[in-house]
């Protein structure tokens, strides 16, 4: 496998590319998503807009684009007081049954094993 990792992708055959992609999905950072899909585990996704998503991953690709189910979106809002100062932080959330998440907004993915 090490010989495929070091070789430029333009020099690999289609079979070698498929083997390399399978290896990267099972051993690299994308293995977190692969295990979550296989075991139907929930994941906690931290997004660039500072929102968190707690969801089950149905599908994903190498760009971290994801199809999610049973999504709980969580964020914090700070209400302004009458004088214009930031007030107390309020935690908010909402439920979304199905969602497509574009991968460029993903910062961190943590798998939460089933109990």
Swiss-Prot record:
InterPro entries: LSM_dom_sf, Sm, Sm_D2, Sm_dom_euk/arc
Start and end residues of each Sm domain: 30-115
Domain of life, source organism: Eukaryota
Keywords (A to Z) from UniProt: Cytoplasm, mRNA processing, mRNA splicing, Nucleus, Ribonucleoprotein
Compartments it resides in: Nucleus; Cytoplasm, Cytosol
Main location: nucleus
Alphabetized GO MF terms: RNA binding
GO annotation, biological process: mRNA 5'-splice site recognition; mRNA cis splicing, via spliceosome; spliceosomal snRNP assembly
Example of a GO cellular component annotation carried by this entry: U2 snRNP
Membership in a protein family: Belongs to the snRNP core protein family.
Function text: Plays a role in pre-mRNA splicing as a core component of the spliceosomal U1, U2, U4 and U5 small nuclear ribonucleoproteins (snRNPs), the building blocks of the spliceosome.
Subunit description: Belongs to the 40S cdc5-associated complex (or cwf complex), a spliceosome sub-complex reminiscent of a late-stage spliceosome composed of the U2, U5 and U6 snRNAs and at least brr2, cdc5, cwf2/prp3, cwf3/syf1, cwf4/syf3, cwf5/ecm2, spp42/cwf6, cwf7/spf27, cwf8, cwf9, cwf10, cwf11, cwf12, prp45/cwf13, cwf14, cwf15, cwf16, cwf17, cwf18, cwf19, cwf20, cwf21, cwf22, cwf23, cwf24, cwf25, cwf26, cyp7/cwf27, cwf28, cwf29/ist3, lea1, msl1, prp5/cwf1, prp10, prp12/sap130, prp17, prp22, sap61, sap62, sap114, sap145, slu7, smb1, smd1, smd3, smf1, smg1 and syf2.
Name of the protein this chain belongs to: Small nuclear ribonucleoprotein Sm D2
UniProt source species: Schizosaccharomyces pombe (strain 972 / ATCC 24843) (Fission yeast)
Gene: smd2
């Amino acid at each position: 496998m090490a010989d495929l990792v070091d070789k430029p992708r333009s020099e690999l055959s289609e079979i070698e590319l498929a083997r390399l992609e399978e290896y990267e999905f099972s051993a690299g950072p994308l293995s977190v998503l692969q295990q979550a899909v296989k075991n139907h585990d929930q994941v906690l996704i931290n997004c660039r807009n500072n929102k968190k998503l707690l969801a089950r991953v149905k599908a994903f690709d190498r760009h971290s684009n994801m199809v999610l189910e049973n999504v709980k979106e969580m964020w914090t809002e700070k209400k302004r007081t009458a004088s214009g100062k930031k007030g107390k932080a309020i935690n908010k959330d909402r439920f979304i049954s199905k969602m497509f998440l574009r991968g460029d907004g993903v910062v961190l993915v943590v798998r939460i094993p089933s109990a």
